Design a protein with these regions (language model features):
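Histidine-centered active-site microenvironments of extracellular/periplasmic hydrolases
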Residues: 162-170, 243-247, 284-339, 351
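C-terminal cap/loop subdomain of S1 sulfatases and analogous C-terminal strand-loop tails that border
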Residues: 164, 172-173, 178-181, 305-311, ...
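A short beta-strand-to-alpha-helix junction
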Residues: 51-52, 74-78, 95-99, 125-136, ...
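Loop/turn elements at helix/coil->beta-strand transitions in domains of secreted/extracellular proteins
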Residues: 52-57, 87-92, 144-150, 170-172, ...
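Long, internal low-complexity/basic segments
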Residues: 4-8, 14-54, 61, 65, ...
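Short, solvent-exposed turn/loop segments enriched in Gly/Ser/Thr/Pro and often Arg
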Residues: 70-76, 90-111, 151-163, 177-181, ...
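Formylglycine-dependent
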Residues: 118-120, 125-128, 132-144, 157-230, ...
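Active-site segment of extracytoplasmic enzymes that catalyze sulfate/phosphate-ester chemistry
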Residues: 21, 33, 37, 58, ...
Length: 529
């Protein structure tokens, strides 16, 4: 009963349920770590002597809370993540999106998820969508530059046609699952098996998914990669996303925590612990192969944690699904021993949208998306030489269907607006909050009435973006279409590329775009009348 209840709760969380406002005292500074931004950071950056292209590894946690790592004061044992922080640079103003599919699409394309039709929700197993085939993904650029590319873990960017899968989006090797919320032990979602290697079914039931992710990453590093090339390795862990499941030996490490039907903190802690162990095996392998110094490692979470399942975003407000800081500002660390100074703190604002151009710049390659990239190259900011602010506003959006509302966030410099639009049966309510996040990062003081000019300015930024890109694309679908059944194995039901029409169709907006532009100008608002 407990496991079934947790699965049901997790299903609703994936779909965008349950705003949660979390307040608390700031966690104590972990021993050996400072919460203060490192002064004169640029002077500590090392001059690189090697001419070899660096390897790149992205380690992505799923729903990890801000305070769920040791270096932020957690009691969860994360010695390997802490090691990355000790040997690298903490990015303390790193922003993702409130939910996972938008974060992943932004990272892979360098584009605003609202332009991809993926800003508001996650892709579920019964949805056929994915990122447009017109977009060029980050691993494609690394592959074009001579890198060996691999992905181990959770995809979640389209799974029903061949061109949406990792092997068609720049990855030479893929081992993992295409859906979210796959059972950690039996590897099923909605009774359909979901683990594969390059399109072929993998039957490894009984093995804990996080262990598989770690072991397969080590396998790539030791056996599969072409050692004559640099490599790009993307490891999106499922952990600590629901279903809340862990190995008993890891659960037993946290006797002082208590599991309850809502907020299974003991099991959640064990899931984070297991992910950290997997990261440790990857780090050890890099050391054993003598390639750690020339490998860029980026660790971050795809969104904030969900407190009802045990995550802790203290002292930030809110959590997953929300555009408050607790939902979008995430734990992030970058390590590159040849270049970045150890045990440093960088508070430059960096977005997940910026990762494609930033990592490309660090590696000395071209970020080759054929579409205009919205992300900003923040590599100089990482080195302590660039501007603290990224120069362009960040817009966040989330659809929470059980509450029938959207929540938006606009961050521009020190000012941040959070706007909640409640669609009631007979009317719509709009609540607008304004924060100075440089002085009030925990968003305790609403300044909307004191600074109406900032509310007006940020609202105009949001309105212009929504007018240019009307709310559309993927919406949260918390239940499948009538009659839908999961396939026995998701790897078996992919539509081959030669069976898919190659001409994109964007819907009513594309068909009527000239008429709409004549009527509304270059914004081309979509109306139905």
């Amino acid at each position: 009963m407990k496991r079934g209840l947790l699965f049901l709760l997790g299903f609703f969380v994936v779909a965008g349920v349950g705003a949660y406002f979390y307040y608390g005292k700031a966690p104590p500074s972990a021993e050996g770590f400072s919460n203060e931004t490192t002064p004169n950071l640029a002077s500590l950056v090392k001059t690189r002597t090697s001419t070899e292209q660096p390897n790149v590894i992205i380690l992505l946690a799923d729903d990890l809370g801000w305070a769920d790592v040791g270096y932020h004061g957690s009691d969860i044992k994360t010695p390997n993540i802490d090691r990355l922080a000790k040997e690298g640079m903490r990015l303390e103003r790193f922003y993702a999106t409130p939910i996972c599919t938008p974060t992943r699409s932004a990272m892979m394309t360098g584009r605003d998820p609202i332009k991809l039709g993926l800003a508001n929700a996650v892709l579920m197993a019964w949805q056929d969508g994915g990122v447009s085939l017109d977009e060029k993904f980050m691993p494609e650029s690394f592959k074009d530059a001579g890198y060996d590319t691999a992905m181990i873990g959770k995809w979640h960017l389209g799974h029903t046609i061949e061109q949406h899968l990792p092997n068609a989006r720049g990855f030479d090797h893929f081992y993992g699952h295409v859906n979210t919320q796959v059972d950690y032990f039996n590897h099923e979602f909605a009774k359909g098996h979901d683990f594969q290697e390059n399109g072929k079914i993998v039957d490894n039931k009984g093995e804990y998914a996080t262990d598989v992710h770690g072991d397969q990453s080590v396998r790539f590093l030791t056996e599969l990669r072409d050692k004559t090339k640099p490599f790009f390795l993307y490891v999106p862990f499922l952990a600590p996303h629901s279903p809340i499941e862990a190995k008993q030996e890891d659960i037993d490490k946290y006797p002082r925590r208590i599991d309850t039907p809502v907020g299974p903190k003991k099991t959640y802690a064990a899931m984070v612990d297991s992910m950290d162990q997997a990261i440790g095996r990857i780090l050890d392998t890099l050391d054993e192969q003598g390639i750690a110094d020339n490998t860029i490692i980026l660790f971050y979470s795809d969104n904030g944690g969900y407190p009802n399942f045990g995550a802790d975003n203290t002292p930030l407000r809110g959590g997953k699904l929300e555009t408050f800081e607790g939902g979008i500002r995430v734990a992030a660390v970058m390590r590159w021993p040849e270049v970045l100074p150890a045990n440093t703190v960088n508070d430059a604002v960096i977005s997940v949208i910026d990762l494609f151009p930033t990592l490309a710049s660090a590696a000395g390659i071209t970020a080759g998306n054929v579409k205009e990239i919205d992300g900003v190259d923040r590599w100089q900011a990482v080195l302590g030489k660039g501007d603290h602010w990224r120069g362009k506003p960040l817009i966040f959006t989330s659809n929470i269907p059980l509450y029938n509302h959207f929540q938006y966030g606009v961050l521009d410099g020190k000012w941040k607006m959070v706007q909640t639009v409640n669609h009631l049966r007979r009317e719509t309510e709009v609540e607008t909050l304004l924060f100075d996040v440089s002085a009030d990062p925990n968003e305790k003081s609403d300044l909307a009435t004191k600074h109406p000019e900032q509310v007006k300015r940020l609202t105009a930024i949001l309105d212009d973006r929504l007018a240019e890109h009307p709310v559309g694309g993927t919406f949260v679908q918390i239940s499948p279409h009538p009659g839908w059944r999961a396939p026995k194995d998701y790897a078996d039901v992919v539509l081959p590329a030669d069976k898919v029409n190659q001409a994109p169709h964007e819907g009513f907006g594309a068909v009527a775009s000239k008429f709409l532009q004549q009527r509304y100008g270059d914004k081309g608002k979509i109306i139905y009348e």
